[in-house]
Amino acid sequence: MCGICGIFDRSGNQVDQGILQKMTTILQHRGPDGEGHYIDGEVGLGHRRLSIIDVEGGAQPIGNEDGTLQIVFNGEIYNFVELRKELEANGHRFTTRTDTEVIVHAYEQWGKECVRRFNGMFAFALWDANRRELFLARDHLGIKPLYYVDLGNRILFASEIKAVLQDPECPRDVDVEALAELFTFRYVPSPKTLFKGIRKLPQGHRMTLSRRDIAVERYWDWVPCLRGNFDEEDLIEEYRTLLEDAVRLQLRSDVPLGLFLSSGVDSGALLAIMNRYSSGPVRAFTIGFEGGEKTNEVEDASAIARMFGATHRFMTVTPEDYLKYYENYLWDIEEPLGNETAAAFYFVSKIAREEVKVALTGQGADEPWAGYDRYLGVKLSTFYSRMPSVVTDQMAPLFARIPGRFERMKRGVASLSEPDVLTRFTKIYSFFNAEMKRQLFKGELMEQIADDEYRSKEALRRLQTDVQHLDPVTQMLYIDTRASLPDDLLMVADKTSMSNSLESRVPFLDYRLIEFVESLPPGLKLKGVTGKYLHKRALEKWLPKDVVYRKKKGFANPVEDWFRNRMRPFVEECLLSSDSAVGRFFDQRYIRRMLETDRAGKDQFRRHIYLLVSFELWHRAFMKN
């Protein structure tokens, strides 16, 4: 895993080497092991290397035999060994042992269709000097990031936003439409970012740049095609075989690797499979939080580690540790999020990097397999919408009594009476609902985003279009895997691990596993009220049932309680000071009422406060400096 960047001048002018150098330098944390550049007239490529495969011989950029192809690459092609054999059989000759060089020869052999053959996580830029074209691609699930900005006469791209901002002509303005979407979804859906004009190349997409044209196209998708007749036991064996092969491939490394271990079933299963293929004890790493006893995973994770003879290292994060990191973490992740797990990934990456360069994680099994409560809510809402009004009218007063701290449940209940699936989804996903936004957003901002609710629904409609003929649960699983997974959770994992110069890998997001899951009927994912049904049945092969069916904790933390108590002065300074960015965009009187409600012990605004503080810190990091 590395950091890549580059410039393509559409007017044909020579690339500014000084800007390219600045772009490369600011990505040093992604690749502390080396730096490389390539310039050919209108194109410039930059690379920072974190050496994983062929440590001695894998410096980038890498070219073909005559130098007419040059590539900078971030990520891993896990099936590079098999592809190399196929390419050698077709007459290609290699000078390194890297997966990077496999991409170059795959492009020679299959052209732009080569991306369909890669099993991995990747973002790369390949310069074809004969065609005078720059070819960029991002992996199937969007595990590795790739940003770009069109400045008219030139296009810049990079693994991180801060690199493209090194060009003084790159604007630093807030995209107010993206801001509205952030407060709806808790993240900004692709292709937008919170920076006006800076875009993400979406998952499973490729882009070709030439002086004549900019072409972006999708090369892969997994529109569900549900199986008809099936045998459940056969499906379980098929899934086990695919998962085991995914882990086997992702253990390919020339440097030490380990595992982020929680108390849950997903990382526990990875440990069991890793233990089978590893020559020595697996190194496992876990994070706990002071005051987070209800969600602390260290004890249960230690028991799983002992079960498989793994070495286990853990850290207990204090409020002081968190505050020291939190003031700078928006510089790492580059966009504010309502995702409070970022700190957990940062700290577990920090302790892991002291021993390994690569860590496998259990991310990616919840969104495809219905691992969250909201999927059950969608299923129940389908039944509720079919009930006669005489029944639902009797239930409404009971729903009104749900305490404010159960904010997600209240949102789900509010959607129950909606007959339209898309409207139901919009209510479920709306973090700040329409009424909250009217009170929070200042008048001039509300005028700019007057059609916010319509656009939020349209953002979901774009994702839903290909699956609207399917049941609501399958639709939501598809939307989450296409949107919240790459634009929120995977982005956090990449940025926080790479800020520690650590590569994180996600075996559950092997694209073959996703295609398998998407072929299953919803009843094998969410059976009755049990999420991840067939997934858990398959994992019984490797783990005791009490671990497989243990209540999910995840990398949780008590940060929202810290905000109310020990971090309260910091929170109030961020949100209520007269020179804050929050005060420019939002009504501080409403924010003060939110804080007063929170201090009174009512929980309905805790996560909203977290997002507001994140926005303030992001603005300080990128707009003020």
Where are the language model's segments positioned?
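A generic secondary-structure signal for well-formed alpha-helical elements
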Residues: 27, 87, 91, 168, ...
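Cysteine-centered catalytic environments shared across enzyme families
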Residues: 1-333, 345, 349, 540-541, ...
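Adenosyl-5′-phosphate
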Residues: 1-4, 113, 166, 197-203, ...
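Active-site adenylate/phosphate-handling loop in enzymes that bind or generate adenylated species
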Residues: 140, 347-406, 484, 489-513
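Phosphate/oxyanion-binding loops and surfaces in catalytic or ligand/nucleic-acid-binding neighborhoods
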Residues: 30, 80, 143, 164-167, ...
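Generic recognition of stable, solvent-exposed alpha-helical segments in well-folded globular domains
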Residues: 18, 234, 238, 242, ...
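Alpha-helix capping and helix-loop boundary segments enriched in small/acidic/polar residues
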Residues: 292, 317, 336-339, 386, ...
